[in-house]
Amino acid sequence: MNHSDTLSLSLELLQQPSVTPIDHTCQTIIAERLAKVGFHIEPMRFGDVDNLWARRGTEGPVFCFAGHTDVVPTGRLDAWNSDPFAPEIRDGKLYGRGSADMKTALAAMVVASERFIAKHPNHKGSIAFLITSDEEGPAVNGTVKVIETLEKRNEKITWCLVGEPSSTHKLGDIVKNGRRGSLNAVLKVQGKQGHVAYPHLARNPIHEASPALAELCQTVWDNGNEYFPATSFQISNIHAGTGATNVIPGALEVTFNFRYSTEVTAEQLKQRVHEILDKHGLQYEIVWNLSGLPFLTPVGELVNAAQTAILNVTGTETELSTSGGTSDGRFIAPTGAQVLELGVLNATIHQINEHVDVHDLDPLTDIYEQILENLLAQ
């Protein structure tokens, strides 16, 4: 069976068991291909994380492909129909961990760049790749550290295309031009442990906190806007008690998360939470963790280039969206870069038997190449 360039490179990358944060030579494979077409290769290792910054050209504007080589753990191997790191094609679908998220997109980016450079060896500006093995994990030694390094030497990205699987029903139907912010908190409410038969000698933190938690759940934080849905508050964990039926717990721990729009700031959310907790007279401690700021790329050069390319290749009028979880775009957007996420279908990401339609790989490559044409062709 003859494989296209993109499928062949995808198969090579999918054979690497690059469970986060292990890269397992994926970046070496990519770097060797890019070096052959004139990219300057700069590996950046921080802690146990491999990162790659590759650039062709020294002038602006800079178009950057961004993505990650790490994948999530496979889960139970006996639940897979085939070895997750021995990719297989069955019924027109390519199976393997990372097939959708996001090794096939990385392959498409490399092949698209090779083809564009062959046609336009003297293209304007620069083409760059920012690849990490720390997107699926803590994301502390990956893209964020590369961006910090680039910022220190005043190396700016103009446009950034992240190859996350953005499509929903067919290739290119959705592109992400922003993401909501993510704010996490661990709330500890102090009570006084005691016997359930003597509640007057104890203070039940579950009872005391319940009205405050109910108010937090019912609060309308904002109404969203044209690009973002309303801010969402979700409690993910509650823990209290010793396991005994006759003991009033001495403390309650609640974990919750905000996915928030550009209508509010993290500081405003924190302030309102404290106001509600204080109003209910709770004795508490709260630890906040901001895991991502919201970002938005309005319609402009990058969005137009992507929409035009998708329409030309697939005939699809794409829809802009900010739904879904966080991505590494949150580290790149604050530099002033226009950021867009565009990749294959996301229906099976992180699942057993993750797969992608083989017939989407070459059109995705064509879309990426046309975006380069639209922005950097002389």
UniProtKB/Swiss-Prot annotation:
InterPro entries in UniProt: Bact_exopeptidase_dim_dom, DapE_proteobac, Peptidase_M20, Peptidase_M20_dimer, Peptidase_M20A
Keywords for this protein: Amino-acid biosynthesis, Cobalt, Diaminopimelate biosynthesis, Hydrolase, Lysine biosynthesis, Metal-binding, Zinc
Cofactor dependency: Zn(2+); Co(2+)
Its biological purpose: Catalyzes the hydrolysis of N-succinyl-L,L-diaminopimelic acid (SDAP), forming succinate and LL-2,6-diaminopimelate (DAP), an intermediate involved in the bacterial biosynthesis of lysine and meso-diaminopimelic acid, an essential component of bacterial cell walls.
Chain sites annotated for binding Zn(2+) 2: 101, 136, 350
GO biological process: diaminopimelate biosynthetic process; L-arginine biosynthetic process; lysine biosynthetic process via diaminopimelate
SUPFAM superfamilies: Bacterial exopeptidase dimerisation domain, Zn-dependent exopeptidases
Subunit structure: Homodimer.
Gene Ontology MF, one: acetylornithine deacetylase activity
Protein name: Succinyl-diaminopimelate desuccinylase
Co-factor: note: Binds 2 Zn(2+) or Co(2+) ions per subunit.
Residues that, per the record, bind Zn(2+) 1: 68, 101, 164
EC number(s) stated in the UniProt entry for this protein: 3.5.1.18
Organism: Acinetobacter baumannii (strain ACICU)
Active site: 70, 135
Biochemical pathway: Amino-acid biosynthesis; L-lysine biosynthesis via DAP pathway; LL-2,6-diaminopimelate from (S)-tetrahydrodipicolinate (succinylase route): step 3/3
Family classification: Belongs to the peptidase M20A family. DapE subfamily.
Catalytic activity entry: N-succinyl-(2S,6S)-2,6-diaminopimelate + H2O = (2S,6S)-2,6-diaminopimelate + succinate
